[in-house]
A protein has these predicted regions:
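Extracellular/periplasmic carbohydrate-active domains that bind, remodel
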Residues: 1-266
Length: 266
């Protein structure tokens, strides 16, 4: 579908109700979501573009999506991309929103097998307030749900050949975000070793933790341990820019970096 507008709507379900996504644009173009309140038990917004068999046949991305002035509460992810994204997600902006009591703020779910057209590009999050979000930013390239999610091919951290099954995460921008009362981790970025996350740019971001922070996993993939008040974890990222990024109150190192090719700190 093209040219969709959702304005001033309330979407409400019990916070413990499974499979209750609020709004899932799939292979849609020119979507505006303005002033919508979400309070539910799953992802508030989940942007998708089909599994690989659909992507090969239709190859239709979700593109030009603008989310602003929304309130998102109690879901797994405030704004989720994937995991069905064989057509890709291009030009998505989230701004001037409030996320409260969600498991994650941004939640990217992808993995090997989604296909070479499963490209995420020009993803922008700015001017956001997050409170009691367990982990504000998650990019997980080893998402393990669905029947094939726990296969060796999907979960292995070894370098595999880049082929027509390999997804790609390109540039993401995060600006002017205040994250208070976080619980699990400041951010969790886990890219594929053979196709690293191309670029993460972060500017003017503050992250602090709840005194009684809960312990849980920041991302749904094999080998990820539960944590509480963890700093930022970034693995397999080609370029990471941290411009006035402040993490306060973490337990352990503020930054855990592995396989980051270029780090710029200002």
């Amino acid at each position: 579908s093209n040219d969709l507008k959702f304005v001033g709507v309330t979407v409400q379900n019990p916070s413990d109700s499974p499979k209750t996504d609020g709004l899932d644009p799939e292979s849609c173009k020119n979507v505006e979501i303005l002033g919508v309140r979400f309070s539910l038990g799953d992802d508030c917004i989940a942007v998708k573009s089909g599994k690989i068999y659909m992507g090969k046949k239709h190859k239709t991305p979700s593109e030009n999506i603008h989310i602003r002035q929304c309130l998102m509460e109690n879901g797994h992810g405030a704004v989720t991309l994937g995991s069905e994204m064989a057509g890709g997600v291009v030009n998505l902006t989230v701004e001037d929103c409030i996320f409260r009591h969600t498991d994650r703020g941004l939640r990217i779910k992808t993995r090997r097998g989604r296909g070479k057209d499963a490209i995420l590009s020009n993803i922008i999050f700015r001017n956001l307030t997050l409170d009691h979000v367990m982990t504000p930013l998650v990019v997980n390239c080893f998402y393990f749900c669905d029947p094939d999610g726990k296969t060796t091919y999907v979960q292995s951290r070894d370098v595999y050949p880049v082929d027509d099954r390999t997804p790609q995460v390109k540039k993401m921008v995060f600006e002017n975000m205040e994250c208070t009362n976080c619980h699990v981790a400041a951010a969790f970025f886990d890219g594929l070793p053979e196709q690293k996350i191309e670029e993460i740019y972060m500017k003017d971001i503050s992250i602090s933790y709840a005194e009684d922070a809960k312990c849980d996993v920041p991302a749904m993939s094999d080998g990820v341990e539960k944590s509480s008040k963890r700093g930022m974890f970034a693995r397999n990222v080609a370029k990471l820019t941290l411009d006035n990024v402040k993490i306060e109150g973490q337990v352990g190192e503020a930054y855990e970096l592995e396989g980051v090719d270029e780090l710029i700190r200002r």
